[in-house]
Amino acid sequence: MANKKKVALACSECGSRNYTITENPNRTERLEVQKFCKYCGKHTLHRETK
């Protein structure tokens, strides 16, 4: 079984890393999703960081 890397999803407004996901090796572009940021108190765009 291959080892999958964990990557973080960081808030685009405050920069806090609120979520972690396992990386899919077949996906080449970085993931961007709308998630709730508990520090901003609202739904913001979260981007994948390495």
UniProtKB/Swiss-Prot annotation:
Pfam families: Ribosomal_L33 (PF00471). The keyword Ribosomal protein applies. Keywords: Ribonucleoprotein, Ribosomal protein. SUPFAM superfamilies: Zn-binding ribosomal proteins. GO terms for cellular component: cytoplasm; ribonucleoprotein complex; ribosome. GO terms for biological process: translation. It comes from the Bacteria. GO terms for molecular function: structural constituent of ribosome. PANTHER family: 50S RIBOSOMAL PROTEIN L33, CHLOROPLASTIC, LARGE RIBOSOMAL SUBUNIT PROTEIN BL33B. HAMAP family: Ribosomal_bL33. Belongs to the bacterial ribosomal protein bL33 family. This is Large ribosomal subunit protein bL33B.
